[in-house]
């Protein structure tokens, strides 16, 4: 699996970072190569990969070793493998997650010869099985959306990566979280507390909050087209007051 890094210290807060060239862009049309650094929650990316393959993936095993994660004993890893075995069978080795009428579905799209015809979606899990997947992803996303942004932005800054090229691929994750109003409000309160902590921080502590607020702005500002550069600009202009309001959008 091509990837640049895995960031985080547990499976529940880990992010997968990869880099790809967009299909088309103005820069490429003018002869320049552009890249997007894509950030995704790790668990949905590895569900369905066989255990042997995961344990031969050096980036993953090195990350687990660095963070003292025993892949033979970790309960979350066992859960990932169990659900993955239910998903991958026969010719079906790739699948997608989607939110449909407020519910999580996982499956694959069939093929169609008519490019104008929307392909049919075929679910891979029944109602009981989808609940176990939903529970795992909910726990992952609740932890990830709060704890992942800071170490990810820290990593980007250390590696001198232009934040304008960074993209958090989390739209489906946010839809899933927002389907539970109580948990969603609790999450937003926690995130608003990040802004409050920034407001009350001493001058020499402000820098510690910068990557966290920028990352959260990039995640929760997607519907407003807030990318890396805009997040930095908003941080400089309005700081956490902007973010506190944004978290309610």
Curated annotation (Swiss-Prot):
Domain of life (superkingdom): Viruses
Protein name: Uncharacterized protein VP11
Species this chain originates from: Colorado tick fever virus (strain USA/Florio N-7180) (CTFV)
């Amino acid at each position: 699996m091509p990837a640049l890094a895995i960031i985080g210290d547990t499976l529940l807060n880990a992010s997968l970072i990869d880099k790809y060239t967009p299909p088309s862009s103005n820069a490429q049309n003018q002869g320049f190569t552009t890249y997007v650094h894509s950030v995704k929650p790790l668990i949905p990316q590895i569900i369905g990969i066989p255990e042997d393959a995961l344990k031969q993936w050096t980036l993953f095993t090195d990350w687990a070793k660095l963070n003292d994660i025993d892949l033979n004993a970790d309960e979350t890893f066992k859960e990932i493998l169990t659900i993955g075995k239910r998903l991958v069978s026969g010719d079906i080795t790739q699948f997608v997650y989607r939110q449909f009428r407020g519910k999580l579905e996982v499956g694959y799209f069939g093929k169609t010869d008519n490019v104008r015809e929307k392909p049919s979606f075929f679910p891979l899990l029944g109602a009981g099985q989808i609940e176990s997947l939903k529970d795992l992803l909910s726990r992952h996303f609740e932890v990830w959306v709060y704890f992942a942004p800071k170490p990810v932005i820290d990593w980007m800054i250390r590696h001198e990566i232009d934040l304008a090229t960074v993209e958090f691929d989390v739209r489906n994750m946010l839809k899933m979280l927002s389907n539970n109003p109580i948990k969603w409000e609790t999450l937003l309160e926690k995130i608003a507390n990040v802004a409050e902590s920034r407001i009350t921080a001493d001058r020499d502590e402000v820098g510690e909050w910068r990557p966290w607020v920028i990352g959260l702005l990039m995640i929760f500002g997607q519907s407003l087209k807030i990318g890396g550069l805009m997040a930095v600009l908003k941080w400089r202009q309005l700081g956490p007051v902007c973010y506190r309001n944004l978290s309610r959008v």
